[in-house]
Design a protein with these regions (language model features):
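Rossmann-like NAD(P)(H) cofactor-binding subdomain of soluble oxidoreductases
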Residues: 2-49
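Alpha-helix N-cap/loop-to-helix initiation residues
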Residues: 16, 44, 69-70, 155
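Conserved strand-to-helix beginnings and helix N-cap segments that scaffold or border functional pockets
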Residues: 20, 46, 71-75, 159
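Short, glycine- and charge-enriched coil/turn segments that flank and shape catalytic ligand pockets
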Residues: 26-31, 68-72, 121, 174-180
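Short, flexible, solvent-exposed loop/turn segments with mixed acidic/basic and small polar residues
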Residues: 50-55, 145-146
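Internal alpha-helical scaffold of NAD(P)-dependent oxidoreductase catalytic cores
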Residues: 53-138
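Interdomain hinge/lid region at the active-site interface
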Residues: 121-187
Length: 187
């Protein structure tokens, strides 16, 4: 689609490195300007009925400029999120993807794994702990597959760390090592 010369564009995607890199690769052919951003707000719900006028208030918004992004463009996009009530952080797109792999993408994958590993016969007995743990797994699987695959490297690292800790918990349980188990559960 055509963009008026000088138009400032941002996005709200869950991964940043590939989006910012794609813009930069074609930047000379485009008339607009781009600054990546990711508001950490929303839910697994979709559609107009899921709208929330306070969605960004008190939430974090991450702005992810490239090295070629003019400072005034970064400030304008940061100002947009700030005006909506968000706390704004500015960081490198790759750093964003690394941090969000640990705090968003891996938790989603783990929630889906917990939901998938729960025997159907156990579901009538699933209480708030199970529901809290698996709530985010109700998100759009097609969308989440794209997010997880787009951030595969950092996500693999985050999931490997989780697998290591899970293995330590399993080892402590199998050994009956209560002290070690308590230590692991406190982290």
């Amino acid at each position: 689609a055509a963009v008026r010369p000088g138009t400032l564009i941002t996005d709200a995607g869950s991964t940043k490195a590939s989006i910012v890199a794609a813009w930069e690769r074609g930047r000379k052919k485009r008339h607009g300007r781009f600054v990546g951003s990711h508001p950490l707000a929303g839910s697994h719900r979709r559609g107009p009925e899921a709208s929330d006028p306070e969605l960004f208030v008190g939430r974090v918004a991450i702005v992810t400029p490239s090295t070629a992004t003019p400072t005034e463009d970064v400030e304008a996009v940061a100002g947009l999120w700030s005006s909506l009530g968000s706390t704004v952080y500015v960081m490198n797109p790759r750093e964003h993807d690394k941090l969000l792999a640990a705090t968003s993408h891996a938790p989603h994958a783990i929630a889906a794994a917990v939901a998938a590993a729960t025997p159907p016969a156990a579901l009538p007995f699933a209480a708030t702990g199970w529901r809290d743990t698996t709530r985010i797994a109700a998100g759009d699987a097609e969308l989440w597959a794209d997010i997880l695959l787009d951030n595969a490297g950092p996500l693999a690292t985050a999931l490997a760390r989780i697998a290591t800790v899970s293995e330590r918990i399993l080892t402590a349980i199998e050994a009956g090592d209560r002290r070690r188990l308590v230590t692991l559960l406190k982290n």
